[in-house]
Structures are given as structure tokens and as C-alpha cells.
Swiss-Prot record:
Subunit structure comment from the entry: Part of the 50S ribosomal subunit; part of the 5S rRNA/L5/L18/L25 subcomplex. Contacts the 5S rRNA and the P site tRNA. Forms a bridge to the 30S subunit in the 70S ribosome.
Disulfide feature: none
Molecular function terms, GO-annotated: rRNA binding; structural constituent of ribosome; tRNA binding
Protein name in the entry: Large ribosomal subunit protein uL5
Stated family: Belongs to the universal ribosomal protein uL5 family.
Function of the protein: This is one of the proteins that bind and probably mediate the attachment of the 5S RNA into the large ribosomal subunit, where it forms part of the central protuberance. In the 70S ribosome it contacts protein S13 of the 30S subunit (bridge B1b), connecting the 2 subunits; this bridge is implicated in subunit movement. Contacts the P site tRNA; the 5S rRNA and some of its associated proteins might help stabilize positioning of ribosome-bound tRNAs.
Length: 183
């Protein structure tokens, strides 16, 4: 296996773990919360009727994450949205390992500072089990995407799944990793 320098993973191991052990009085290093995976979801309403649009967004999400997305299908028919069961309605990527750490670094240090009118992440977006969710309204904040190559603006939901038992532990984990939260 190729070892690769990942700044955020090294920061986690050398700085964040000791801080969390001290703050929450953990006796064992295995008690310290860590990030398990990141799930990126992109709902594409027109994707069910426009295969070309779906493929363009599929390539964009693959460029952003470095991994091929899975096409999500509708679980049931909804007549108001003109959706039938089994239609393509979105894209999903689950990142683990090196790609996860690289994506986290990119989000915290490159993407979030480029978001227009960004004043920090909402600290109330934890789910009660230590997982954090937030959304981006456009994909152009990623350096891999330029506005002229994309057919339309498309947002995405990002879920950071941690092993933290409480929201306070997960908040401190993400804060020590450099995520900008509102005060």
C-alpha cells in the first residue's frame, strides 16, 4: 500500500486526539471519536427525465470526490413530482480512508472559504448521535468545477459520520480539525 501524506489525518493523530483525550478524560485512545465516513448526496429532480443532465452531474460529482457516484432511484411513485418508482432521482458517494481525509481538508480549507456570504457552519446541525450534516447550494465552490462547463447550478448534502457518542464530542472533533462554526 502506498503511504501518502495527508495533512488533516496527521493533524488528527498528533494534535486532535491528545486534545480530545484531555478535554473528555478518555483513558483509552480507542475511546476518542474519529470520522468514519462522509456521504455526499446530490438530488437531481430533472435527472429522471434528462439522462444527459444526470451524466454531467455524475461526472462533476466524480471530479469533486475522486470516486464514481452511485445513481439513487425513487423508492416509490409520487405523482405531484411526476416520479415513478425506480426512476433515477439523485447521486450518492460514500468516502472512506484517504479520499475521506482529502475531501475533509478540501471542504474546511478551500471550499467553505469560497462560499458567498459564509459566516460559519451551524452548530445545531448535529443529529443527536454525533453526526454532522450541512448543505452547499452550488457546486462551483469546488476548484474542479467551472461555471461554464456545468449545465446548471446544483446543490448537495454532505453528512460527516463520526464514532462520537454525543454531539458535544463530535463538535469538538470537527472544531479541532479546523471546521469554522458560528459563535
Amino acid at each position: 500500500m502506498v503511504t501518502q501524506y495527508i495533512p488533516l489525518k496527521e493533524k488528527y493523530e498528533k494534535e486532535v486526539v491528545p486534545k480530545l483525550m484531555k478535554e473528555f478524560n478518555y483513558r483509552n485512545i480507542n475511546q476518542v471519536p474519529r470520522i468514519e465516513k462522509i456521504v455526499i448526496n446530490m438530488g437531481i429532480g430533472e435527472g429522471s427525465r434528462n439522462a444527459d443532465l444526470l451524466n454531467k452531474h455524475l461526472k462533476e460529482l466524480a471530479a469533486i470526490t475522486g470516486q464514481k457516484p452511485v445513481i439513487t432511484k425513487a423508492k416509490k411513485s409520487i405523482s405531484n413530482f411526476k416520479i415513478r418508482k425506480g426512476m433515477n432521482v439523485g447521486l450518492k458517494v460514500t468516502l472512506r480512508g484517504l479520499r475521506m481525509w482529502n475531501f475533509l481538508y478540501k471542504i474546511a480549507n478551500i471550499v467553505l472559504p469560497k462560499v458567498r456570504d459564509f459566516r460559519g457552519l451551524n452548530p445545531n446541525s448535529f443529529d443527536g448521535h454525533g453526526n454532522y450534516s450541512f448543505g452547499l447550494t452550488e457546486q462551483f465552490v469546488f476548484p474542479e468545477i467551472t461555471p461554464d462547463q456545468s449545465p446548471k447550478t446544483q446543490g448537495m448534502d454532505i453528512v460527516i459520520v463520526t464514532t462520537a457518542k454525543t454531539d458535544a464530542e463530535a463538535f469538538k472533533l470537527l472544531e479541532f480539525l479546523g471546521f469554522p462554526f458560528k459563535r
